[in-house]
């Protein structure tokens, strides 16, 4: 900007200036434009922090899910059918978590950062949304399935061994995937149309948007509440069983303690997802209160811009933490997977120590000469 522009600008008396000020010159009704533009800049900074932390944390979550699959799948192939029943859902958790991370990276770091959703890329945007929604329901379904397997395996071993076959578990996983796809595709289409209306279809605030929001709310929180109640019920049942038989069988207590710890941290991850899902609905309900939003509205209410940016940062942070915790739960608290991971860590440590010793010896050839002379 030139000096002449600053003298005629509503930001002329501001101590700091920003390149985007020219876009707000027509917003002359602000009582404190300097404070407002500063808050807009703060919101932009928060958005940058959101972007970079999302890339870092979701990438860590993806690597952990991949590592969990690398450990679990070879173990799964060598297991007997009774053991495979539990690990089907563990593998499903890792796969759905990985797909969910990919969806978050697509939406958070590509469409919301580099490529604005438009009619040209609408099918790809719908695909990313469907992947996000569907993976969430598959993840929650795998939580419920895993809890059911643990409940039957500990409290009703006869039903677990005689009536629950591996084929039934596979069918249950397929049903979870089919239901998730059936739910995610239409929801993704209508959510995309809220952002990018087309000439043939649209989803406005006066037409379908309230209904889609309500349906999404019922489905999301219904599934989250169902998952939370199921995990809580199974956890309480296992804790009571552990208390009753604590002094009878040390071996079963070891397995039972592992199952209880697994359920506790899984329940914690689900509660994080509940908190993360509350935020979008809070934002949407807040925005609904403003029926008419002009181009200068958010400049006049710059505090709300920071509020929305903080909400977005909090939501993505909670999601990323939950998706990092989930594979860690499988790796740390499942006895078989944990033992395999521990063996790999020991092997890597031993290999690194051996490599360092070789490099050290090669870098000090005098030591070899002295040793041979002696």
From Swiss-Prot:
Organism field: Caenorhabditis elegans
Protein name: Putative G-protein coupled receptor-like protein B0244.6
Presence of the UniProt keyword Transmembrane helix in the record: yes
Organism classification: Eukaryota, Metazoa, Ecdysozoa, Nematoda, Chromadorea
Tagged with keyword Transmembrane: yes
Residue ranges annotated as Extracellular topological domain: 1-54, 108-137, 191-216, 284-304
Localization per record: Cell membrane
Signal peptide: none
Family, similarity comment: Belongs to the G-protein coupled receptor 1 family. B0244 subfamily.
A GO-annotated cellular component: plasma membrane
Superkingdom of source: Eukaryota
Residue ranges annotated as Cytoplasmic topological domain: 76-86, 159-169, 238-262, 326-374
Bilayer topology annotation: Multi-pass membrane protein
Gene3D superfamilies xref list: Rhodopsin 7-helix transmembrane proteins
TM region(s), chain numbering: 55-75, 87-107, 138-158, 170-190, 217-237, 263-283, 305-325
């Amino acid at each position: 900007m030139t000096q002449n522009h600053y003298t005629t600008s509503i930001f002329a008396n501001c101590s700091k200036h920003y390149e985007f000020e020219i876009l707000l010159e027509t917003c002359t009704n602000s009582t404190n434009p300097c404070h407002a533009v500063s808050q807009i800049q703060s919101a932009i900074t928060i958005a940058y922090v959101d972007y970079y932390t999302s890339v870092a944390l979701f990438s860590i979550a993806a690597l952990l899910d991949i590592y969990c699959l690398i450990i679990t799948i070879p173990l799964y192939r060598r297991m007997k059918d009774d053991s495979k029943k539990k690990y089907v859902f563990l593998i499903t958790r890792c796969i759905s978590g990985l797909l969910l991370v990919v969806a978050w990276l697509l939406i958070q770091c590509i469409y919301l950062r580099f490529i604005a959703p438009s009619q040209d890329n609408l099918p790809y945007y719908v695909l990313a949304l469907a992947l996000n929604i569907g993976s969430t329901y598959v993840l929650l379904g795998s939580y419920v399935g895993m809890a059911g397997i643990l409940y039957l395996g500990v409290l009703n071993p006869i039903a677990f061994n005689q009536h629950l076959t591996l084929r039934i578990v596979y069918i249950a996983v397929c049903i979870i995937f089919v239901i998730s796809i059936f739910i995610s595709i239409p929801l993704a289409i209508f959510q995309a149309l809220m952002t990018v209306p087309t000439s043939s279809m649209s989803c406005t605030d006066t037409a379908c948007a309230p209904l889609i929001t309500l349906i999404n709310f019922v489905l999301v929180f219904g599934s989250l509440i169902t998952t939370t109640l199921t995990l809580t019920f199974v956890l309480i049942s296992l804790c009571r069983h552990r208390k009753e038989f604590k002094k009878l069988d040390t071996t079963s207590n070891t397995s039972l303690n592992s199952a209880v710890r697994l359920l506790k941290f899984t329940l914690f991850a689900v509660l994080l997802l509940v908190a993360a899902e509350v935020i979008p609905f809070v934002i949407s309900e807040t925005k609904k209160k403003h029926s008419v939003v002009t181009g200068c509205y958010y400049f006049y209410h710059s505090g709300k811009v920071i509020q929305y940016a903080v909400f977005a940062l909090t939501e993505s942070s909670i999601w990323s933490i939950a998706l990092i915790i989930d594979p860690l739960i499988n790796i740390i608290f499942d006895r078989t997977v944990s033992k395999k991971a521990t063996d790999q860590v020991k092997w890597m440590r031993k290999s690194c120590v051996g490599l360092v010793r070789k490099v050290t010896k090669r870098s000090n050839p005098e030591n070899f000469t002295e040793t041979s002379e002696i």
